[in-house]
């Protein structure tokens, strides 16, 4: 079993849902990211998604776009992110997902990247702009290296799309809760629970829900239906306001509150 499968299995045994936290690697620099990942885990994150900064992040709203810009300005590269994960693996076994766009992976070389990512200790890749029907080469590479490849479902995904993602995905399935780009929203969609329950019934893999979840209350509401909850933009906003030890303290407090919300929704 992979680290991700192990984590979901242990959570299920305890009757808990997963809190998945997203931050951009290299915002404001990779040394800070290393400390942030350890703090996220300490505060209650069950899995960590590291965003790979990209100059044209089409699926991301302004908060994560600005975060990506800050990371690129600090000189963050894909090889440097893999070195960061290697350092983290000396200190933590928290499952780590690299989330980003295909262009940097293509430039690196799919097979070489999958191998290097696995060697560094990455657990999974989530490539936002690579649908399963275009992912054969990368999937072959990730399968051979023991990496999970995570695909997206959206509110407009029909049953055939759900079936395709169920066949080709591994680790977990990421359900995008809203149409549009990433970003915090004031409320969860009225029909989200029913739709998530419907999709989840067609899957063997865990289903996590992300995009737009920004409060402990929303996290708890989503956790009632899903296997896990992803919080990204609401966390990334802290990087606009705080630095150093204060950033870690503020992030830790918020993640602890999110975890309590998820636990409440798990019951």
Swiss-Prot record:
GO cellular component: cytosol
Pathway(s) the chain acts in: Amino-acid biosynthesis; L-tryptophan biosynthesis; L-tryptophan from chorismate: step 5/5
EC number: 4.2.1.20
Gene3D superfamilies for the chain: Aldolase class I
Catalytic site: 49, 60
Any one Pfam family match given in the protein's UniProt record, by short name: Trp_syntA
A single MF term (Gene Ontology): tryptophan synthase activity
Key word Amino-acid biosynthesis present: yes
Record PROSITE patterns: TRP_SYNTHASE_ALPHA
Quaternary structure and interacting proteins, as annotated: Tetramer of two alpha and two beta chains.
Sequence similarity: Belongs to the TrpA family.
Its biological purpose: The alpha subunit is responsible for the aldol cleavage of indoleglycerol phosphate to indole and glyceraldehyde 3-phosphate.
Protein name per its UniProtKB record: Tryptophan synthase alpha chain
Gene source species: Geobacter sp. (strain M21)
